[in-house]
Amino acid sequence: MPALPILALALAPLLVNGQLSGSVGPLTSAHSKAATKTCNVLDYGAVADNSTDIGSALSEAWDACSDGGLIYIPPGDYAMDTWVSLSGGKATAIILDGTIYRTGTDGGNMILVENSSDFELYSNSSSGAVQGFGYVYHREGDLDGPRILRLQDVSNFAVHDIILVDAPAFHFVMDDCSDGEVYNMAIRGGNSGGLDGIDVWGSNIWVHDVEVTNKDECVTVKGPANNILVESIYCNWSGGCAMGSLGADTDITDILYRNVYTWSSNQMYMIKSNGGSGTVNNTLLENFIGRGNRYSLDVDSYWSSMTAVDGDGVQLSNITFKNWKGTEADGAERGPIKVVCSDTAPCTDITIEDFAMWTESGDEQTYTCESAYGDGFCLEDSDSTTSYTTTQTVTTAPSGYSATTMAADLTTDFGTTASIPIPTIPTSFYPGLTAISPLASAATTA
């Protein structure tokens, strides 16, 4: 077998500034893993004919390389009829340079990686993809098909330079993971709720340079979670980024989102709960640009789309929204600032600063606050935390609201009844910024 064009990676995990608590990423490089052992799925029965099931071959290759090695899926089209549970890996990498097409109909997760450490999944060509063909389910009104990718209890990991398309359910979930990095990804799903882009909970995880198209979560933090850094995110006709839904015993702290561009989505950022208990604190949401979104800054502690949970409410504190600009779809119907907190668990130490947004329809917009205390706009600055409700109506556009757009903004969604094309991964995910890390394809061809 010819030598693999493996991306040269640092031998040590990466340490970046921000809300992270330490280093992230694999402990050893793909080069060192390949030098230990290489397991090509073609040697285990895979055939790039878009017919033969790759599931068993991938499982066997994992078993052979899970104690240290690199699993290679060469360029070509592969059918996946049976799902894989890849468990117990130590110093293992998977290079996906081909395209996997869902043909099976089981629920669960097409690809589950669990109880593993020092793990990496990526494409040398930055074109490796999984096509879920979710529209086959969605056109029948079925949102209970499989997820594409789930990492569960995985530490010191990276997932990058791959494309996930049209999941029957969620696209990518990180469940109780730690010390990981996710970047240089394109996720493209159907125009329906329940088709989440990225959901993450765990500790010390960096998500950056990701584009998401769908109609539900773009990149969303769930609980429990701490020290999560999310930056350079392109929600391109999506549901938008969020936190939640939050329920009982919520424990989320040290979260930073920055450089998030949101176009034609449900919201720029939403913190959503209904009852429940626990806390969210020490969170910064800065450098947000929005255009054409239904909601902008949306904190809703009485979110009616979830069933109420027992408890006085999730306590939100020390949360800052900074440097937001752009336009919302209709500022009178859905104002750009909505901070509705629980009367029995008021929000405290909330800050809204450098916030300039204006309506695309009409000539007025509203700011609404309820039981929310802090500094800025309709927030009450008081030592008292008695319940209150206030709505401010503004008829003059704020200065500085105009913002740069992205050339790749979609002009329509992809619906739910037809196959969704596989996109390419962009090199910019926020106006004026290039990706923090170059695409793997650029590194391997340099």
UniProtKB/Swiss-Prot annotation:
Residues 1-18 form the signal peptide. Coiled coil: none annotated. It is found in: Secreted. Keywords: Carbohydrate metabolism, Cell wall biogenesis/degradation, Disulfide bond, Glycoprotein, Glycosidase, Hydrolase, Polysaccharide degradation, Secreted, Signal. GO terms for biological process: cell wall organization; pectin catabolic process. Optimum pH is 3.6. Transmembrane segments: none annotated. One of its GO terms (cellular component) is extracellular region. The active site is at 216 (proton donor). InterPro entries: Glyco_hydro_28, Pectin_lyas_fold, Pectin_lyase_fold/virulence, RHGA/B-epi-like_pectate_lyase. Gene3D superfamilies: Single-stranded right-handed beta-helix, Pectin lyase-like. Glycans are attached at residues 50, 115, 124, 236, 281, 318. Disulfide bonds join 39-65, 218-235, 341-347, 369-378. GO terms for molecular function: polygalacturonase activity; rhamnogalacturonan alpha-L-rhamnopyranosyl-(1->4)-alpha-D-galactopyranosyluronide lyase activity. Its EC number is 3.2.1.171. It catalyses: Endohydrolysis of alpha-D-GalA-(1->2)-alpha-L-Rha glycosidic bond in the rhamnogalacturonan I backbone with initial inversion of anomeric configuration releasing oligosaccharides with beta-D-GalA at the reducing end. Belongs to the glycosyl hydrolase 28 family. Pectinolytic enzymes consist of four classes of enzymes: pectine lyase, polygalacturonase, pectin methylesterase and rhamnogalacturonase. Hydrolyzes alpha-D-galacturonopyranosyl-(1,2)-alpha-L-rhamnopyranosyl linkages in the backbone of the hairy regions of pectins. This is Rhamnogalacturonase A. The lineage of its organism: Eukaryota, Fungi, Dikarya, Ascomycota, Pezizomycotina. The gene is rhgA.
